[in-house]
Amino acid sequence: MAIDMLSTFIKPMHREGKKFVAIFAGVTLLLFLIWEPLGWIGVLLTVWCYYFFRDPVRITPTREGLIVSPADGVVSLIEPAVPPAELGMGPEPMTRVSVFMSVFDCHVNRAPIGGTVTAVAYRPGKFLNASLDKASVDNERNALAIRLADGRQIAVVQIAGLVARRILCDVKEGTPLLTGERFGMIRFGSRLDVYLPEGVEPLVSIGQVMTSGETVLADLTSTEARRSGAAR
């Protein structure tokens, strides 16, 4: 029973977080030597740092054609938009679904669908609030184009936010990806944009809470109309 309870709270940690947790823990030890109350504040900050870099296992649906959320967070925008020019996907608008991640969300990013990475393009920029529409254009970003088995393409864009200062991407052109596979992360608050292929409608609504690698965002085989939702 105790082991089961611990497993509920203790999750695997992304490798990027190990150095930060080590630094926080070291500073905490020094704070205890200086003044015990400061040490306990350090403990809380160390625990928060571990929590931020958590990398829990996700159960990804494996049915062909499903597109899953690439990030934990809340759907902040659904609108037509031209994918980043640096990906070379053309000037035609695609349906863009934006998932905003707060500092309390898991920041590990996962592939929305299986395919082959055909382009990876980093572009420096500003650090505006990632929930703003113009963040897609103005902010620092890293964009991926993924070619699906049927030849269609999907774009995934990691966007730095007001607090985020580092985008990590572990894939390069030619990398094969499975649906839900980890491909990077963004540190300390950010956003993920997904550009859907033509004719594919999102099956989520603005304000909906998303779980990376699990929540179905769209279905390539579905003829269902775009969903709408309301807070209850």
From Swiss-Prot:
Q: How is the protein modified post-translationally, according to the record? A: Is synthesized initially as an inactive proenzyme. Formation of the active enzyme involves a self-maturation process in which the active site pyruvoyl group is generated from an internal serine residue via an autocatalytic post-translational modification. Two non-identical subunits are generated from the proenzyme in this reaction, and the pyruvate is formed at the N-terminus of the alpha chain, which is derived from the carboxyl end of the proenzyme.
Q: Does the keyword Disulfide bond apply?
A: no
**Principal localisation:** membrane
Which Pfam families does the annotation name? PS_Dcarbxylase (PF02666)
**Keyword annotations of the record:** Cell membrane, Decarboxylase, Lipid biosynthesis, Lipid metabolism, Lyase, Membrane, Phospholipid biosynthesis, Phospholipid metabolism, Pyruvate, Zymogen
Topology in the lipid bilayer is annotated as: Peripheral membrane protein
Cofactor-binding details, from the entry: Binds 1 pyruvoyl group covalently per subunit.
Q: Where is this site: Cleavage (non-hydrolytic)?
A: 189-190
Which domain of life does this protein belong to? Answer: Bacteria
Q: Which GO terms describe its biological process?
A: phosphatidylethanolamine biosynthetic process
InterPro entries membership: PS_Dcarbxylase, PSD-A
Q: Which cofactor does it need?
A: pyruvate
Q: How does it associate, per the subunit comment?
A: Heterodimer of a large membrane-associated beta subunit and a small pyruvoyl-containing alpha subunit.
**Entries under NCBIfam families matching the protein:** PRK05305.1-1 (NF003677), PRK05305.1-2 (NF003678), PRK05305.1-3 (NF003679), PRK05305.2-5 (NF003685)
Protein name (database record):
Phosphatidylserine decarboxylase proenzyme
Tell me what gene encodes this.
psd
